[in-house]
């Protein structure tokens, strides 16, 4: 079995048209630098509420799928605006030559991302959709 090296890992990101909807085939993904990621999906089991099938309880049913985890990314000039847009929503932009982007908090709907972490040495690729940025630490 191949061994994955971090230097060869890749992170691709694209904004989704609506929450959980995969970007279309013509959407360009950005290749982003990252330090580490622990994104992963989990689907637990919940008790089945069906009654009337005898004394034995029914088998549990699947709960909703959750994608959780942390991602460490560097603060760089090229991609910092993308992370601000994911955290605060689309900016208000003014200017034709000298652009000025203003980000504000409190927007009712925030964008979601489709992220793909790739380990080409194995090869293994993990896609997570509906990813939203919760917080940023500097």
Residue ranges of each PLM-predicted region?
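Signature of extracytoplasmic/envelope-associated structural regions
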Residues: 1-138
């Amino acid at each position: 079995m191949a061994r994955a090296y971090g230097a060869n890992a890749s992170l691709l990101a694209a904004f989704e048209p609506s929450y959980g909807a995969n970007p279309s085939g013509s959407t360009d993904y950005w290749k982003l630098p990252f330090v580490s990621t622990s994104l992963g999906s989990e689907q637990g089991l919940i008790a089945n509420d069906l009654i009337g099938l005898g004394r034995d309880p029914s088998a549990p049913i699947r709960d909703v799928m959750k994608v959780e985890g942390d991602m460490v990314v560097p603060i760089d000039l090229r991609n910092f605006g993308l992370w601000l847009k994911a955290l605060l929503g689309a900016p208000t932009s003014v200017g034709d030559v000298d652009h000025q982007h203003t980000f504000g908090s409190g927007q009712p709907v925030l964008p979601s991302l489709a992220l793909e972490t790739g380990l080409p040495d194995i090869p293994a690729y993990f896609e997570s959709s509906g990813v939203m940025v919760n917080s940023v630490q500097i």
